[in-house]
Amino acid sequence: MRTPHLPEAIATRKYFDREFDRQAIKLLPNEYYVTGEDVVLTTVLGSCVAACIRDEKAGVGGMNHFMLPDDEGGTADRMLSASMRYGCYALEVLINELLKMGARRERLEAKVFGGGAVLANMTTLNIGDRNADFVLRYLKTEEIRVAAQDLRGPHARRVSYFPVTGLALVRRLTRQDDQVSVERDERALARAIATSGTAPSRGGELFTRASASRTPS
């Protein structure tokens, strides 16, 4: 079986966020960002998941945004060799970049979000559940403490993460237009992964300022 190419891109979309009165970085699918600056990292998640990981003592933190490849019709070996390797890579890139900036593995804490049922009808196994299960299992295996989580459920989410303080704000996107937009983009992402064995290094624009319910983590 062909080994999938596993690109992971540093997020480059920066803007000034008036709501939080600071510099912000938008993460698209298959992107990550690590920093020690007082900025906000934002992303929108449907079935995808984001891991927000920091070392409080080192003062560095980061976020990623990824989706496991669809293994519908595949064997268990294929799932381990493709999907699991893909997810491990996405998290290892984030963790390794944190370590390069002075973080210590034993001090890392994580907050994880996403895994919604946005693409529930795409396979017999909900992609969101699989993404959520994977990220929790990975962090447990790596002995990284999960300080907070908001996973699964029917809605897409907008996550705002402040890596210096560790604060994470989650808005559930309940408007039908937002749900449809996220579902459309994530279906395209899932098809791209299934077709090529990888995700594009730049995903579609998923971000919205629409009103939505909001909960801190």
UniProtKB/Swiss-Prot annotation:
Q: What is its EC number?
A: 3.5.1.44
Which GO biological process entries does UniProt record here? Answer: chemotaxis
Give me the ranges of the annotated region Disordered: 194-217
The top EC class is hydrolase
Q: Name one GO molecular function term.
A: protein-glutamine glutaminase activity
Q: Which Pfam families match?
A: CheD
Keyword presence, Hydrolase = yes
> InterPro entries attached here?
CheD-like_sf, Chemorcpt_Glu_NH3ase_CheD, Cytotoxic_necrot_fac-like_cat
By its UniProt entry, which Gene3D superfamilies does this protein fall under? 3.30.1330.200
Provide the alphabetized UniProt keywords. Chemotaxis, Hydrolase
Give the source's domain of life in one word: Bacteria
Q: Which reaction does it catalyse?
A: L-glutaminyl-[protein] + H2O = L-glutamyl-[protein] + NH4(+)
Could you tell me which CDD domains the record lists for this protein? CheD
Q: What protein family does this chain belong to?
A: Belongs to the CheD family.
Checking HAMAP family in the record gives: CheD (MF_01440)
PANTHER family (UniProt xref): CHEMORECEPTOR GLUTAMINE DEAMIDASE CHED-RELATED (PTHR35147:SF2)
What does the record give as the function of this protein?
A: Probably deamidates glutamine residues to glutamate on methyl-accepting chemotaxis receptors (MCPs), playing an important role in chemotaxis.
User: Any idea what this protein is called?
Assistant: Probable chemoreceptor glutamine deamidase CheD
- Origin organism is Cupriavidus pinatubonensis (strain JMP 134 / LMG 1197) (Cupriavidus necator (strain JMP 134))
